[in-house]
Amino acid sequence: MALLKFFISKKEITSDIAKERLQIIVSEQRKNSKEPNYLPMLKKDLIKVIKKYINLNSETLCVKLDHKNKKNIKIFELNIVFPEKNFLNKK
């Protein structure tokens, strides 16, 4: 029985260690990421809203988030290239 407990407890400890390591890796990747997690979803939502009013190619939309270290300010920048032909109102 003692031998069985030894092997069972070893598996539990190993899985806990693996889980902890994975959590550390994920948290480090999030810290090092310059782009917030919500930015891709925000870009998709903006494209949907803009497409309601004009014909727009998704590739002409540029979304960027800058971080100013001096004042700890985040700046959200949105650039859209509107072709002259596609300024037709869709409503």
Swiss-Prot record:
Coiled-coil stretches noted in the UniProt entry, renumbered to this chain: none
Keyword Transmembrane in annotation: no
Any one of the GO BP annotations: regulation of division septum assembly
Pfam families tied to this protein: MinE (PF03776)
UniProtKB keywords: Cell cycle, Cell division
Disulfide bonds: none
Presence of keyword Cell division: yes
Record-stated family: Belongs to the MinE family.
NCBIfam families per record: minE (TIGR01215), PRK00296.1 (NF001422)
HAMAP family assigned: MinE
Protein function: Prevents the cell division inhibition by proteins MinC and MinD at internal division sites while permitting inhibition at polar sites. This ensures cell division at the proper site by restricting the formation of a division septum at the midpoint of the long axis of the cell.
Identification of the protein by name: Cell division topological specificity factor
Species of provenance: Wigglesworthia glossinidia brevipalpis
